[in-house]
Swiss-Prot record:
Catalyzes the reversible conversion of 2-phosphoglycerate (2-PG) into phosphoenolpyruvate (PEP). It is essential for the degradation of carbohydrates via glycolysis. This is Enolase. It is found in: Cytoplasm; Secreted; Cell surface. The keyword Glycoprotein does not apply. It comes from Actinobacillus pleuropneumoniae serotype 3 (strain JL03). GO terms for biological process: glycolytic process.
Length: 436
């Protein structure tokens, strides 16, 4: 048993130039874990609270000194002397100490940073790579898989300053046999997409997640540009590369009139009409996964969408489920969607994140591990994806070091597992009903 001997919180800067919380947890023997909390732009209303200072004289009110103070004081005092490998106990101590349903006293950003730093320190004390330690915490020691990347190569919505309503247009290199090959395919398509956009006189500046953010006449135009890029890269769309979208529908849903208002192309849809709009895109392009295809509160709309599309493609709940087992349980019981997006800052601790992944898998749902639009160099989600054998990961495009850091960690993990004679299987999309 290695006891926690020091806990340090600090304010650092994320990929959008906003502050976030970093935590250091020190154990006996000199073992140290360092972790930082990510931050979202389009957020579900039922996410755990990200505590900001609100002091307009610092960082336009987005400082996190209150959360950092909680780490350095109340949280540190509560967990000093505890066994660093008692992850569930430590997380529960912080949850109970906070005492709110949404971690609004200390902030999910404070609790999560300490939770992850504790896991990293404990892994180091046991001489284990983080993914192996996570697998132990998950109750699945030695069970790993390399995740299929869902690469966000055209950004819209809240992730870009353009007129594209749908937030993410992604590619999935399903023809790859390894993670490293998948990244090569993704990079080649990404660079060819830059050429396609330039040839059309379109902007090749990138958005928050490293994808291009051009102004386009329609969402279908984004898919057409990607199709051209895939072909120019020498790949076959639908065989080597498939497509995915994150609609982030809550961002353009008008609660007053119940319509999905896509201002970028001047169209409005009822709930069912929007499902059929997406169905039309799926008929035209090999789209294998759609995230948040309805507003988070439109459960009737989600039920209809699941009925229409759920047997054909992956329907991922992000704002819908917010990595929360209570909400996911209700969704499973009602047959809503067939997959959950996993963002550990939505719930605020590693223990609760693992519980959500387990609940999803036990119900036959897939779990997609995800970054946030505000990230740091922290690559914990790479280890989380491998250690839970989740099978899929969303961590942005092939640019911006805050995104590429996760891909590079996956390369290292794949290499290490192969060198140990235990190569991990690849491509979790095959688990989805209706997929090849």
């Amino acid at each position: 048993m290695a006891k926690i001997v020091k806990v340090i919180g600090r304010e650092i800067i994320d990929s959008r130039g906003n502050p976030t919380v970093e935590a250091e947890v020190h154990l006996e023997g000199g073992f140290v874990g360092l972790a930082a909390a990510p931050s979202g732009a389009s957020t579900g209303s039922r996410e755990a609270l990200e505590l900001r200072d609100g002091d307009k004289s610092r960082f336009l009110g987005k400082g996190v000194l209150k959360a950092v103070s909680a780490v350095n004081n109340e949280i540190a005092q509560a967990i000093l002397g505890k066994d660093g490998s008692a992850q569930t106990e430590i997380d529960q101590i912080m949850i109970d100490l906070d005492g709110t349903d949404n971690k609004s006293k200390f902030g999910a950003n404070a609790i999560l940073a300490v939770s992850l730093a504790t896991a990293k320190a404990a892994a180091a004390s046991k001489g284990l790579p983080l993914y192996a330690y996570i697998a132990e915490l998950n109750g699945t020691p030695g069970v790993y898989s390399m995740p299929l990347p869902m690469m966000n190569i055209i950004n819209g919505g809240e992730h870009a300053d353009n007129n594209v309503d749908i937030q993410e247009f992604m590619i999935q290199p399903v023809g790859a046999s390894t993670l490293k090959e998948a990244l090569r395919i993704g990079a080649e398509v990404f660079h060819n997409l830059a050429k396609v956009l330039k040839s059309k006189g379109l902007n090749t500046a990138v958005g928050d997640e490293g994808g291009f953010a051009p102004n386009l006449a329609s969402n279908a135009d984004a898919l057409a540009c990607i199709k051209e890029a895939v072909e120019k890269a020498g790949y076959v769309l639908g065989k080597d590369v498939t497509l995915a979208m994150d609609c982030a529908s809550s961002e353009f849903y008008n609660k007053e009139n119940g319509l999905y208002e896509m201002k970028g192309e001047g169209k409005s849809f009822t709930s069912q009409e929007f499902t059929h709009y997406l169905e039309g895109l799926c008929n035209e392009y090999p789209i294998k996964s759609i995230e948040d295809g309805q507003d988070e509160s439109d459960w009737e709309g989600f039920a209809y969408q699941t009925k229409v599309l759920g047997g054909k493609i992956q329907l991922v709940g992000d704002d819908l489920f917010v990595t929360n087992t209570k909400i996911l349980k209700e969704g499973i019981e009602k047959g809503i969607a067939n997959s959950i997006l996993i963002k550990f800052n939505q719930i605020g601790s590693l223990t609760e994140t693992l519980a959500a992944i387990k609940m999803a898998k036990d119900a036959g749902y897939t779990a997609v591990i995800s970054h946030r639009s505000g990230e740091t160099e922290d690559a914990t989600i790479a280890d989380l994806a491998v250690g839970t054998a989740a099978g899929q990961i969303k961590t942005g495009s092939m640019s911006r070091s805050d995104r590429v850091a996760k891909y590079n960690q996956l390369i290292r993990i794949e290499e290490a597992l192969a060198a140990a004679g235990t190569p991990a299987p690849f491509n979790g999309l095959k688990e989805v009903k209706g997929q090849a």
